[in-house]
Amino acid sequence: MLERAQRTLRREVRYSGVGIHFGKSATITLEPAKENTGIVFCRSDLLGEHIPALLPHVCNTGRSTTLSSGDSIIATVEHLMAALRSSNIDNVIVRCDEEEIPIGDGSSHVFMQLIHDAGVCTQNDKVSIARLSQPVYYQAQDTFLAAFPCDELKISYTLHYPQSPTIGTQYRSFVITEESFRKEIAPCRTFALYNELCFLMERGLIGGGCLENAVVFKDDGVISLGQLRFPDEPVRHKILDLIGDLSLVGRPFVAHIVAVGSGHSSNIALGRKILEVLQP
C-alpha cells in the first residue's frame, strides 16, 4: 500500500481579489489544520458555516465548480483546489468572506504562491494513496473521460474547438507532480470565446471578468494582456480544471485520466465513478 505523511501549511496566509463570476471583492485565508481534517471551506461572513471539499457537496458546475452546505455556498473552487492537491496539501481551512473564491489572474499561480509563502509541514498521521480497482469512464455527447489503473497520476487531454480557428484541436499529456503542475499547468489562465461573452453576461456570469484574469479568443486572433503563456494554454488550463475538480474525490489517488472535451460537470461525474472503485 502506497502512503505518505499528511501535510498542512506551516503558517496562515491571506489573499484578496475579485470573483470572476459574481464580481465581488473577497478575501480568503488559508489556515493550517490538524491531521485528518481534510480541505474545508468556511464562510467567515456566515457564522463560520463549514463546507467540506468533497463530491457530495458539489451543487453547481455551470462554468465553474460550486460547493454548498445548508444555505451556504462557495463558488469557483477549482483553481485553488488544483493548487492544494498538486502540492499534496491534505489538511487546510479555507476561510472566505464572500460566496466566491477570488480569481487572481485566472490561473492557479496566485494560489501556488500562497502555498509557497505559507510553507508546508509534514504531520504525524499517514495518508494512503488510493488506486483504481478497475477502469471507469463517462461519456455524454462529444465529451468522453476515462480513468485507468496506473502507478502515477497522469492526465491526457484533447481539446477540440472547431468553432474557434485560433484554438482548434490541442492535446497535452502530463504526469502530475508538484513540479510539473507549478511549471507547466498552474500559470495557464481561464479562457472564453469572444462570441460567448454576451451569453455569459446575460446569465449573470463573468461579472468580474476582464483581461487581467482571462484570455479571449476571436476567430482572427487572441485578446490578452501580453502573449499566451504557452501556445497551447487552453488545453493546459483544461487540465488544471480537471485536477481541481477530481481533487473533490477527497483523497489522493493514482490513475491515468484520458479526457476529450470535458468540463466541470463531466469532470465531477468521472470523479464520482472513480470514488466507487478506489482501493484500499
Swiss-Prot record:
<comment type="function">
    <text>Catalyzes the hydrolysis of UDP-3-O-myristoyl-N-acetylglucosamine to form UDP-3-O-myristoylglucosamine and acetate, the committed step in lipid A biosynthesis.</text>
</comment>
<dbReference type="InterPro" id="IPR020568">
    <property type="entry name" value="Ribosomal_Su5_D2-typ_SF"/>
</dbReference>
<feature type="active site" description="Proton donor">
    <location>
        <position position="264"/>
    </location>
</feature>
<protein>
    <recommendedName>
        <fullName>UDP-3-O-acyl-N-acetylglucosamine deacetylase</fullName>
        <ecNumber>3.5.1.108</ecNumber>
    </recommendedName>
</protein>
<dbReference type="GO" id="GO:0009245">
    <property type="term" value="P:lipid A biosynthetic process"/>
</dbReference>
<dbReference type="GO" id="GO:0016020">
    <property type="term" value="C:membrane"/>
</dbReference>
<feature type="binding site">
    <location>
        <position position="241"/>
    </location>
    <ligand>
        <name>Zn(2+)</name>
    </ligand>
</feature>
<feature type="binding site">
    <location>
        <position position="79"/>
    </location>
    <ligand>
        <name>Zn(2+)</name>
    </ligand>
</feature>
<dbReference type="GO" id="GO:0103117">
    <property type="term" value="F:UDP-3-O-acyl-N-acetylglucosamine deacetylase activity"/>
</dbReference>
<comment type="pathway">
    <text>Glycolipid biosynthesis; lipid IV(A) biosynthesis; lipid IV(A) from (3R)-3-hydroxytetradecanoyl-[acyl-carrier-protein] and UDP-N-acetyl-alpha-D-glucosamine: step 2/6.</text>
</comment>
<keyword id="KW-0378">Hydrolase</keyword>
<comment type="similarity">
    <text>Belongs to the LpxC family.</text>
</comment>
<dbReference type="GO" id="GO:0046872">
    <property type="term" value="F:metal ion binding"/>
</dbReference>
<dbReference type="InterPro" id="IPR015870">
    <property type="entry name" value="UDP-acyl_N-AcGlcN_deAcase_N"/>
</dbReference>
<keyword id="KW-0441">Lipid A biosynthesis</keyword>
<dbReference type="InterPro" id="IPR004463">
    <property type="entry name" value="UDP-acyl_GlcNac_deAcase"/>
</dbReference>
<keyword id="KW-0443">Lipid metabolism</keyword>
<feature type="binding site">
    <location>
        <position position="237"/>
    </location>
    <ligand>
        <name>Zn(2+)</name>
    </ligand>
</feature>
<keyword id="KW-0479">Metal-binding</keyword>
<keyword id="KW-0862">Zinc</keyword>
<dbReference type="InterPro" id="IPR011334">
    <property type="entry name" value="UDP-acyl_GlcNac_deAcase_C"/>
</dbReference>
<keyword id="KW-0444">Lipid biosynthesis</keyword>
<dbReference type="Pfam" id="PF03331">
    <property type="entry name" value="LpxC"/>
</dbReference>
